[in-house]
Amino acid sequence: MSVQVAAPGSAGLGPERLSPEELVRQTRQVVQGLEALRAEHHGLVGHLAEALAGQGPVTGLEMLEEKQQVVSHSLEAIELGLGEAQVLLALSAHVGALEAEKQRLRSQARRLAQENVWLREELEETQRRLRASEEAVAQLEEEKRHLEFLGQLRQYDPPAESQQSESPPRRDSLASLFPSEEEERKGPEAAGAAAAQQGGYEIPARLRTLHNLVIQYAGQGRYEVAVPLCRQALEDLERSSGHCHPDVATMLNILALVYRDQNKYKEATDLLHDALQIREQTLGPEHPAVAATLNNLAVLYGKRGRYREAEPLCQRALEIREKVLGADHPDVAKQLNNLALLCQNQGKFEDVERHYARALSIYEALGGPHDPNVAKTKNNLASAYLKQNKYQQAEELYKEILHKEDLPAPLGAPNTGTAGDAEQALRRSSSLSKIRESIRRGSEKLVSRLRGEGAAGAAGMKRAMSLNTLNVDAPRALGTQFPSWHLDKAPRTLSASTHDLSPH
């Protein structure tokens, strides 16, 4: 038996399409009505049975039996309707469960699709990193071969240079950029130099011991001792002399150096700005100490890659030193070197060549063509030429350095000089060994770049090969120059390393 359910008030308008939720709700209402009707029919059946049991006449009995049959048929129809309604409700619940499962599966499919996209992206990133790692490994293997070759060349270096290379002094990791004022005055003998100058301002006697201790601790890497020592001394000075005092500026300068050695360039820069302000107020804007602080600030900005901000500071330091010390003073030449390096990192090569040329003329006028500073400046100028692809000019400078610079006498050569001459030669050997190592790297870069030019650079390659015989068979005595055949026919050649000589 089927049951047709119509919405209330829709009589005569035909059946109306109901939503699944409304259909289920009305079906439940029908079930409740049928259950009530079934209970009522059960009551009628009971009353009819009682009436039949007590009825006497035959005609009345037949009527009651007929009523009982009608009620029984109605009760069966009600039972059938209830069964169909229960089936409909169960079917609705099942359909609802299937729909929920369908939605869950759709959601899971969307999530899996998104995860698949993520996994694909992760796989691509992993493959990219793998390729980069393989390229890095190949580059490192090539660099390792170059370093092994250069290590084999070191056995031909003079003994004095070898000993120095085994125990090099501790330097700043970015000292290849350019030295600050204090770096040039600081060394193993600093503890014994009681009147050492720091940035053009003489360290007071009461601060010299503290300064030497801080330099010693910083040189040993014991910054946990050096920094509190500086801060305690700074607090004592500020309590006794006030903040705006030259001694406070000096201590700020020392603490800035310690921070710089720890690569804490921002903290060091803030301290130097404070020291600069104090020195300008107490010593005047054109004092050499102000110029030194400006130079140190320029160095820190340069090491942080902020060359545009460093250049005006370096330019102002140069102007002060020219006015106070004269245009031909060695400190002016040092400042010109620093300014040239800053310009080089900004691509201002015309200014670079002009500054180096002026510094070179100052060094040659003061110390002659054999002054180590002359070779150092020429080496820097050659590096600038390399950056401009001026290989011929760079080659000529390297040749000039190699031909003009004296080298230490080889092991076993007769010693005819006095003790003072030997000490001077030792100091000169130490300086030249550093210059020689710098020239070695520059010539490697020159050879590497010329090789990269292919056939067009074949002529330049022949010129460059005359530079790849550094440190071979030193002359018998100091002052002897390299003969030209020695540069052209030496069996040892430098590796075409990709190491960049230029400052970073």
From Swiss-Prot:
InterPro entries in UniProt: Kinesin_light, TPR-like_helical_dom_sf, TPR_rpt
Renumbered ranges of TPR repeats: 207-240, 249-282, 291-324, 333-366, 375-408
Signal peptide: none
Modified residues (Phosphothreonine): 498
Modified residues (Phosphoserine): 173, 466, 502
Keywords: Coiled coil, Cytoplasm, Cytoskeleton, Differentiation, Microtubule, Mitochondrion, Motor protein, Phosphoprotein, Repeat, Spermatogenesis, TPR repeat
Record field: compositional bias (Low complexity): 158-167
The keyword DNA repair is annotated on this UniProt entry: no
Highest taxon in the source lineage: Eukaryota
GO BP terms: sperm mitochondrial sheath assembly; spermatid development; spermatogenesis
Gene3D superfamilies (alphabetical): Tetratricopeptide repeat domain
Coiled-coil region(s): 90-150
Classification via Pfam families: TPR_12
Name assigned to this protein: Kinesin light chain 3
Lineage of producing organism: Eukaryota, Metazoa, Chordata, Craniata, Vertebrata
Gene that this polypeptide is encoded by: KLC3
